[in-house]
Swiss-Prot record:
Its main location: nucleus. Keywords: mRNA processing, mRNA splicing, Nucleus, Phosphoprotein, Repeat, RNA-binding. Residues 196-205 have a biased composition (Gly residues). Residues 73-114, 185-376 are annotated as: Disordered. PROSITE patterns: RRM (PS50102). This is Serine-arginine protein 55. It is found in: Nucleus. Extensively phosphorylated on serine residues in the RS domain.
């Protein structure tokens, strides 16, 4: 069956039919799987399942290798060139590509080909979830040439359709707006933000923007970056020249000022550090002196207090009889004994003084007396 066969390229070494069955599982029933050296073919029962598989699995990894999933055209034994010519043949409205008169009116041949993005875009609202992008594209061909179609990719129950010309887009709005598609009435709204990146499209492989839009965006970015870099370089050169001029005018003054300021700051920091160190060094000495003085004073006070306490204790510990005895001796014995002792002492002193005074006189008088005795 034409259109239900899929080409799988870039298969890893040692791949089996089971691997391909798992890879394509969920996209419909498969009729046949054929594996060759590095590539293979998978045939589905329905061509819609084949289109969905191409749309979703192209560029995915199989056993660690990225594979190419494309719709197969012609015989499997044909060369890649023959498959390329057959695959991209068809009407321009079916997505662009090579024009072929034989397949001009064939519906299946117009389904494949790279998408052509345009600015004439319509947003299809209230789209049934059972409607695929292929169904939407076929339905919109009633108004004109459809270059791109997508369904349920950005939002659910919403599709995108792009036309080849403005007139085709307007006829689609007039003719197909508020019509019923698969049980739902669709609404067509013009999207003035045309050129958005979308997936899928006419061939199932066109998920990137067209080359023209890419080249335009790249050229604009490059021009903007060049302008910004040019303006930045100009501003930098101006700032550098101004800075160089201002610096070249008075380099000596600025250096001398900076040196003097640095020296002043160093002197101030040194003086501050010295004063802090002096105060720190003096303060412990003062504290030590005050502590030693307070200790010595406290020791002296404690000593004097202990002495006074000991004296007071001694005075308290002495018996009162001593005082009575001393007073008794003073008042009773002193009159009797002191008079005799004093009289004897006085007599002794008198006799001594007389003997001292009389001894030289007697010595001087002794020769006279002797002489007198001799005369007699």
């Amino acid at each position: 069956m034409v259109g239900s066969r899929v080409y799988v390229g870039g298969l890893p070494y040692g791949v089996r039919e089971r691997d391909l069955e798992r890879f394509f599982k969920g996209y419909g029933r498969t009729r046949d799987i054929l594996i060759k050296n590095g590539y293979g073919f998978v045939e589905f029962e329905d061509y819609r399942d084949a289109d969905d598989a191409v749309y979703e699995l192209n560029g995915k990894e199989l056993l660690g290798e990225r594979v190419v999933v494309e719709p197969a055209r012609g015989t499997a034994r044909g060369s890649n060139r023959d498959r390329y010519d057959d695959r991209y043949g068809g009407r321009r409205g079916g997505g662009g590509g090579r024009y072929n008169e034989k397949n001009k009116n064939s519906r299946s041949s117009s389904r494949y080909g790279p998408p052509l993005r345009t600015e004439y875009r319509l947003i299809v609202e209230n789209l049934s979830s059972r409607v695929s992008w292929q169904d939407l594209k076929d339905y919109m061909r009633q108004a004109g040439e459809v270059t791109y179609a997508d369904a349920h990719k950005q939002r659910r129950n919403e599709g995108v359709v792009e036309f080849a010309s403005l007139s085709d887009m307007k006829t689609a709005i007039e003719k197909l707006d508020d019509t019923e598609l698969n049980g739902r009435r669709i609404h067509l709204v013009e999207d003035r933000r045309g050129g958005r990146s979308g997936g899928g499209g006419g061939s199932g492989r066109g998920r990137s923007r067209s080359s023209s839009s890419r080249s335009r965006s790249r050229s604009r970015r490059r021009s903007r970056s060049r302008r910004s870099s040019h303006s930045r370089s100009k501003s930098r050169s101006r700032s550098k020249s101004r800075g160089g001029r201002s610096k070249s005018k008075s380099p000596v003054k600025s250096r001398s000022r900076s040196r003097s300021r640095s020296n002043k700051s160093r002197d101030v920091s040194k003086s501050k550090s010295k004063s802090h160190s002096r105060t720190r060094s003096r303060s412990p000495k003062r504290e030590r002196d005050s502590r030693s003085r307070s200790r010595s004073v406290s020791k002296r006070e404690s000593r004097s207090r202990s002495r006074s306490k000991s004296i007071h204790r001694d005075s308290r510990s002495r018996p009162p009889t001593v005082s009575f005895k001393s007073s008794f001796y003073k008042f009773t014995t002193m009159p009797f004994f002191c008079s005799d002792r004093s009289a004897s002492a006085e007599n002794k002193s008198r006799s001594r003084s007389r003997s001292r005074s009389a001894s030289p006189k007697n010595g001087n008088a002794s020769p006279d007396r002797n002489n007198e005795s001799m005369d007699d």
